Curated annotation (Swiss-Prot):
SMART domains: SecA_DEAD, SecA_PP_bind. It comes from Bradyrhizobium sp. (strain BTAi1 / ATCC BAA-1182). Part of the Sec protein translocase complex. Interacts with the SecYEG preprotein conducting channel. Has a central role in coupling the hydrolysis of ATP to the transfer of proteins into and across the cell membrane, serving both as a receptor for the preprotein-SecB complex and as an ATP-driven molecular motor driving the stepwise translocation of polypeptide chains across the membrane. Zn(2+) binds at residues 934, 936, 945-946. This is Protein translocase subunit SecA. Residues 908-932 are annotated as: Disordered. GO terms for biological process: intracellular protein transmembrane transport; protein import; protein targeting; protein transport by the Sec complex. It is an enzyme of class 7 (translocase). It is a peripheral membrane protein. The gene is secA.
């Protein structure tokens, strides 16, 4: 109460911050007449002037006002669009490294140009992050007109580019791309062996579009580069046959936590089935050697009980394709990890693909926190403001709309069953369609969108076939005639190719669009339809300019007329009076786009995103959610109380309860889920930070090694540290000479360093100390390496040392990642022993890291002491086969996006007959099998001789 009163008197913190920008907005506006008088060349020259001012010591803040004014003028001349005052405020928020929350249709894409241009003047590169390739291409092509006019270059990073194209795009002043592409490029760069092969040039400033989707929905899901393991398809198919043999009493399903566990009876049954199939090792299912089997049994159970076809995934062309729960889009190429995707393939009886091993990974949380400055834009971030500040130190600033929002958000209607709910939705669609009001129906899954589509078909509606040319002609013709066309479009993962087109035309009179959640986000729905989209579609192939101009005028007239029809599609409703009260009241509900939600999402933000599609730039609109007690949110989070309430109210079949209390109760349930998900993300981040700290050390060290012309000093330090550890192990400090393990030391020197030294003789010398012993061994090892340098020359040796060091580091780092994953999976059990799992994880991860570094010293020293160089020419080190993938934001399971990367061409050398090989000339050997005898005549296998480091 007191807080509300204070806000009334003094305004909220957000209001005060927005007011604080007004002086600079006024200053920018004051420059407008002056800049309007400049010629194009004079306006373009301002970029060089700004750069000169920065070089003289001015800051970006010092030149913000003239720079923003310059961008506004350039936009007017190139795009015909002028930044509103509120858009200038949005640009300042972005420049300050915060989140600008702007409603749909307020021009976020144009707002970004202000902060992008200003920060690009620093010459360090600005990254604009979008959610898909289509938006990256669209926004870059559109906004590059402003940047190009002002003398700045623009690049685009999308799937399918090679490294040379990526490097050029990153070298531009401004780079547009998707969050996945930026993250994968960072991981791939840190697997390269030469600096010149790296494509990114640093992380200075990023503006993230749809920031809530990327930094929250996908926050806990890592980007992963992986390599394939052995094929085990028969094993998965065998395991899959066991699940149908189980009864529901054999396992417990927890939908809230998305887990399934075997009961005691289920374990016994599975044990018997495994034993009969010859898959059980030892006596019990829970013997150590069966850990992997138990894991895959659980994954098969999850595949059958928690994952539903056409909701979580679809089967297309013999492949299981994941569906993104937030957008309803297909994610071709992405795969669940830990054997879950293989379990789904076995369940659906399609070809089981091999599993993968993690080679490198990073979460978006840790990737985006690397930027010196990070900012974001979205229409819905206020509900997650605490999390965005807590994790990313980003404040959410709500930017006022240019025109007041005129959308009517109605109370939810709650029905007992889904059948009743769908009947009510159908009736509402028919009423809206009769007055030509366009309707967008949001669904939570493909399955639900197709149930609704089936309902519409049963009642005489026809689905638009977007595969045919001019698919919307009938809809346009009906709108011109002022009659309902009874046509509908479905936008889900099955029809994602036409996504932008379907969404853009969802504002045509009489249009009915069924969309899975926020599919099509990033494309505005304009009342009357999209001028750009229709011109693109309807003038394609017209070469005569006069004919083309006439067609464009016809389209413009069409859209203006359609807009008027939609604005007038109001509904007049008479509200029945309560007994004994005044006569019935008449209410006029607005026209515009009508949003119908078919169920509530776990997150209020996703619901707000759906609502926000209507009411853009002051247009009228309305929204309403239709719910049932059988909906997932209601069923999992407390429908029992609502059910008993409806029973007490005597609610009949087909009747709904509509009351603000219901909305508040649902909002509280959503807040609980959001708080739980925030805690999960925060906890996961604490664990991921442990790996992230180690990742930064390794990646920074790799870059330093590549930058160094010679790593000889590093190699010598590693060799000396290893020898020191070896001597300390066998010759303990303060021990008597007779207590020394001389034989063990001599044996390890031979095994690791490949040198035989008279250590036993040295140990017998009078008064010899361990320091003297250490010094002699180091001297002999150094002389051995110096001889190799003398034999091959310093240039060759520098290359060999760097290559072996980087390759060994990468190999051990990959093994270390696997160890950390295994540790992470079991560390939670420490909580039962009253120990903090996070502290235990930190401690053990550090111990593993130290062990890896010690192993690195030994492995690099051993390889360099034994290496023999065969080829005369320099060869690139060969990277393992790699695939890029990312994890599902809803379930927390890894989805793997197979983007096969071949960074080094494979050798095409052919085998050469033994008699044609010269033992002293490796260039005559051709391709030698690893297990063949080495052609040099040593008697060793090739892999243990010249083939070891060739």
């Amino acid at each position: 109460m007191i807080g509300a009163l204070a806000r009334k008197l003094f305004g909220s913190a957000n209001d005060r911050r927005v007011k604080g920008y007004q002086a600079r907005v006024n200053a920018i506006n004051a420059l407008e007449p002056e800049l309007a008088k400049l010629t194009d060349e004079q306006l373009k020259a301002r970029t060089a002037e700004f750069k000169a001012q920065l070089a003289e010591g001015k800051t970006l803040d010092d030149i913000l006002v003239p720079a923003f004014a310059t961008v506004r003028e350039a936009s007017k001349r190139t795009l015909g669009q002028r930044h509103f005052d509120v858009q200038l405020i949005g640009g300042m928020v972005l420049h300050e490294g915060d989140i600008a929350e702007m409603k749909t249709g307020e021009g976020k894409t144009l707002v970004a140009t202000l902060a992008v241009y200003l920060n690009a003047l620093a010459g360090k590169g600005v990254h604009v992050v979008t959610v898909n390739d289509y938006l990256a291409r669209r926004d870059a092509g559109w906004m590059s007109q402003i940047y190009g006019f002002l003398g700045l270059t623009t690049g685009v990073i999308v799937h399918g580019l090679d490294d040379a194209e990526r490097k050029l795009a990153y070298a531009c002043d401004i780079t547009y791309g998707t969050n996945n592409e930026y993250g994968f490029d960072y991981l791939r760069d840190n697997m390269k062996y030469r600096l010149e092969d790296m494509v990114q040039r640093g992380h200075y400033f990023a503006i993230v579009d749809e920031v809530d989707s990327i930094l929250i929905d996908e926050a806990r899901t890592p980007l992963i580069i992986s390599g394939p393991l052995d094929d085990r398809s028969d094993f998965y198919n065998t395991i899959d046959t066991f699940v149908p043999k189980l009864d529901k009493s054999d396992y417990d399903v927890d939908e809230k936590q998305r887990t399934v566990t075997l009961t005691e009876a289920g374990m016994e049954k599975i044990e018997t089935l495994l034993r009969d199939a010859g898959q059980l090792k030892g006596e019990s299912l829970y013997d150590v050697e069966n850990v992997s089997v138990v894991h895959h049994i659980n994954q098969a159970l999850r595949a059958h009980t928690l994952f539903t076809r056409d909701k979580d995934y679809i089967v297309r062309d013999g492949e299981v394709v994941i569906i993104d729960e937030f957008t309803g889009r297909m994610m071709p190429g992405r795969r669940y990890s830990e054997g879950l995707h293989q379990a789904l393939e076995a369940k659906e009886h399609v070809q089981v693909q091999p599993e993968n091993q993690t080679l490198a990974s990073i979460t978006f949380q840790n990737y985006f926190r690397m930027y010196e400055k990070l900012a974001g834009m979205t229409g819905t971030a206020a509900t997650e403001a605490d999390e965005l500040f807590d994790i990313y130190k980003l404040e959410v600033v709500e930017i006022p709309t240019n025109l007041p929002v005129a959308r009517l958000d109605e109370d939810d209607e709650v029905y007992r069953t889904q059948q009743e709910k769908y009947a009510a939705i159908l009736a509402e669609i028919e009423r809206a369609n009769s007055r030509l009001q366009p309707v967008l129906v949001g669904t939570a899954s493909i399955e639900k969108s197709e149930v609704l589509a089936a309902y519409l078909k049963q009642h005489g509606y026809k689905q638009i076939d977007f595969g045919s040319e001019r698919a919307l002609d009938k809809l346009y013709a009906a709108a011109r005639a002022g009659k309902p066309a009874k046509l509908f479009a479905v936008l889900n993962a099955r029809f994602h190719e036409q996504e932008a087109y379907i969404v853009a035309e969802a504002g045509v009179p009489g249009a009915i669009t069924i969309a899975t959640n926020m599919a099509g986000r990033g494309t505005d729905i304009k009342l009357g339809g999209s001028l750009e989209m229709r011109i693109q579609q309807e003038t394609a192939g017209i070469t005569d300019e006069t004919e083309k101009a006439a067609k464009i005028e016809q389209i413009k007239a069409d859209i203006a007329r359609f807009r008027e029809i939609v604005l007038k599609a109001e509904e007049t409703v008479e509200i029945e009076p309560a007994k004994g009260s005044k006569p019935a009241k008449t209410v006029v509900k607005p026209g515009g786009l009508y949003i119908i939600g078919s169920e509530r999402h776990e997150s209020r933000r996703i619901d707000n995103q759906l609502r926000g599609r209507s009411g853009r730039q002051g247009d009228p609109g309305r929204s309403k959610f239709f719910l049932s007690l059988e909906d997932d949110l209601m069923r999992i989070f407390g429908s029992d109380r609502l059910d008993s309430m409806l029973t007490r109210l005597g609610l009949k079949e087909g009747e709904a309860i509509i009351h603000p209390w219901i909305n508040k109760a649902l909002e509280k349930a959503q807040q609980k889920v959001e708080a739980r998900n925030f805690d999960i993300r925060k906890n996961l981040l604490k664990f991921d930070n442990v790996q992230n700290d180690q990742r930064k050390v390794i990646f920074d060290q790799r870059v330093e090694l590549m930058q160094d012309e010679s790593v000889a000093e590093t190699i010598a330090d590693m060799r000396h540290a290893f020898i020191d550890d070896l001597v300390s192990k066998h010759v303990p400090e303060h021990a008597y000479a007779e207590q020394w393990d001389v034989a063990g030391l001599k044996e390890e020197l031979k095994r690791v360093l490949d040198i035989e030294l008279p250590v036993d003789e040295w140990a017998k010398e009078e008064g010899i100390a361990d320091e003297e012993l250490l010094k002699r061994i180091e001297t002999h090892a150094d002389e051995r390496m110096a001889a190799k340098v003398g034999q091959w020359g310093p240039d060759v040796m520098r290359y060999v040392e760097k290559t072996i060091l980087l390759q060994t580091l990468d190999h051990l780092w990959r093994e270390h990642l696997v160890m950390l994953d295994h540790l992470r999976q079991v560390i939670g059990l420490r909580g039962y022993g009253q120990r903090d799992p996070l502290q235990e994880y930190k401690s053990e991860a550090f111990t593993l890291f130290e062990a890896m570094i010690a192993h690195l010293r030994e492995a690099v020293t051993a390889q360099l002491m034994r290496v023999e160089i065969v080829p005369p020419e320099e060869q690139q080190p060969v990277l393992p086969p790699m695939q890029a993938h990312h994890a599902n934001p809803t379930t927390g399971e890894d989805e793997m996006a197979f983007a096969n990367v071949s960074l080094v061409p494979s050798s095409g050398a052919a085998p050469v007959p033994a008699e044609a090989r010269n033992p002293n000339d490796p260039s005559t050997w051709g391709k030698v099998g690893r297990n063949e005898d080495c052609p040099c005549g040593s008697g060793k296998k090739y892999k243990h001789c010249h083939g070891r480091y060739a």
